[in-house]
Amino acid sequence: FTVFYVFYLAACNFTRTMPFKTLGDAYAGGTSRFVFQTSGSSAEAYLTRPAGLGPFPLMILLHGHTLGPIGAESVLSEAEAFASDLCYAALAVSLPGYGATEVPPGTDPKITLNVVLDAVSLVKRLPWIDSRRLYVYGFSRGAFFAALLANRLEEIEGTVLHSGAYDLNRVYQGNIWFRSMLNPTGEKNPKLISILPEVATWHAPTLILHGEEDFLVSVQQANLLSESL
């Protein structure tokens, strides 16, 4: 359920690296990069602050598969759009295996979820963040993890899922492109996750976006999710 990129839009604003402890004074209207400790290692994230005093709702952005050493940087344009157009703060996290995040990737989704949850826990402490109003946006690979977050953050008020896969068993059976990624050890009957059984318990509104002619991840995945809501 990956989407391959050759190009991505560069973020409009200048980005600077800051220690997390100084982000309480991050400049308004800008994006700051920070590294935080998680899962016995370190991970990279970007935080965009809107103009004004706040506190601001927080949009959590989870990126898709990228080529080269790019992670959360690939969704900074979207992060800055949320900040400038909607006055939402935006947190973009480089998932394990991407960007400067050093947490080793793996097939267990908890590895990625723990990194994201640790980043969110840190950012919620900032005085200009409204910790009671969280939103999550996930694209492709990121949409899968965004869907998993829906029941793991009580403060989520809305979810946007773009071009994701939500029943990995169906993806595995129907698309040979993803078999080596979903089953790297070559197990005969791999146990893969389906998010669909838990969807009925989601409490926040959900927007599902998917291209009808997507040749990598079938629009059937979006339809299955929609029918389960």
Spans of model-derived segments:
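Conserved alpha/beta-hydrolase "acid-adjacent" motif
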Residues: 215-221
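Short amphipathic alpha-helix adjacent to the substrate-entry channel of hydrolases
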Residues: 73-91
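Mobile cap/lid helix-loop segments that gate and shape the active-site cleft of serine hydrolases
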Residues: 71, 164-198, 204
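Short beta-strand/loop motif that positions the catalytic acidic residue
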Residues: 202, 208-210, 214
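Alpha/beta-hydrolase active-site loop
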Residues: 107-126
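Active-site glycine-rich loops that stabilize anionic/oxyanionic intermediates
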Residues: 56, 63-68
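Alpha/beta-hydrolase fold nucleophile elbow
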Residues: 129-140
